[in-house]
């Protein structure tokens, strides 16, 4: 077959009937997308057999059994640990999570005393606008931030005492005749170190015994250093 002298191939029936390739339905993009999703999600049985033929099922080996046992044991231990932690917190720290954190990280051996201490702190924070003789002048309260926002741990700082100055007079009440500070005045340096260490550590009722001993030793060493390095009254000046 030739058209105007140009040889044309013999047209088949499919191409001859209205050019079938021009009459195919052109789907929109969203239509093609959803058609693809439906074909993936809801394949017919024939489609499943064609795309994914049945494979022989793998038999579980002893490694698989060991892995399953280990996973089951770990899961059981984790659940038991969480249950034990919840039971511990509910039994010992049912009132306050803050007290629980304080007891865990500050070494508190008397939770009731600590709880009352925190309750007093909270009540003082609520009543910051009310004058309190224990807190001092309300206008100067922001300067006492450690009293309100401290951690509550009873670790007192080391008290620096200048042994070169004369000791304050003893505070003795005429009714009881309590002259507990007279030995510190008459004893001089060593007596002052012992009495001040005892006085400081007596307020540390929440610390264990070994911490009290460490505290006393540190205070004695610091005060001995201050006493040695401080100016002496009878020392001769090198200028003279």
Curated annotation (Swiss-Prot):
Species classification: Viruses, Duplodnaviria, Heunggongvirae, Peploviricota, Herviviricetes
Residue span of region Disordered: 119-143, 164-200
Coiled coil: none
Entry keyword set: Host membrane, Host-virus interaction, Membrane, Transmembrane, Transmembrane helix
Subunit structure: Interacts with host ATP1B1.
Protein name stated in the entry: Protein UL136
Compartments (UniProt record): Host membrane
Transmembrane segments: 69-89
UniProt membrane topology term: Single-pass membrane protein
A cellular component term, taken from the record's GO annotations: membrane
Predominant cellular place of this UniProt entry's protein: host cell
Recorded family membership: Belongs to the HHV-5 UL136 protein family.
């Amino acid at each position: 077959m030739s058209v105007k002298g140009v040889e044309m191939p013999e047209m088949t029936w499919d191409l001859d009937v209205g050019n079938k390739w021009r009459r195919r339905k052109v789907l929109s993009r969203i239509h093609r997308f959803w058609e693809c999703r439906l074909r993936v999600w809801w394949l017919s049985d024939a489609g499943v057999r064609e795309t994914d033929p049945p494979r022989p099922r793998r038999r579980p080996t002893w490694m698989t059994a060991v892995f399953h046992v280990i996973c089951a044991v770990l899961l059981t231990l984790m659940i038991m640990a969480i249950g034990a932690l919840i039971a511990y917190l509910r039994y010992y720290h049912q009132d306050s999570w803050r007290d629980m954190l304080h007891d865990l990280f500050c070494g508190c051996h008397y939770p009731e005393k600590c709880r009352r201490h925190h309750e007093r702190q909270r009540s003082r924070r609520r009543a910051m606008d009310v004058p309190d003789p224990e807190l001092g002048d309300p206008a100067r309260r922001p300067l006492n931030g450690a009293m309100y926002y401290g951690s509550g741990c009873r670790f007192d700082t080391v008290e620096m005492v200048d042994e070169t100055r004369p000791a304050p007079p003893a505070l003795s009440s005429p009714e009881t005749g309590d002259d507990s500070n007279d030995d510190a005045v008459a004893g001089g340096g060593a007596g002052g170190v012992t009495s001040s260490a005892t006085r400081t550590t007596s307020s540390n009722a929440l610390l264990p015994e070994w911490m009290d001993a460490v505290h006393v030793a540190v205070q004695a060493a610091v005060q001995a250093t201050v006493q040695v390095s401080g100016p002496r009254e009878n020392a001769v000046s090198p200028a003279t």
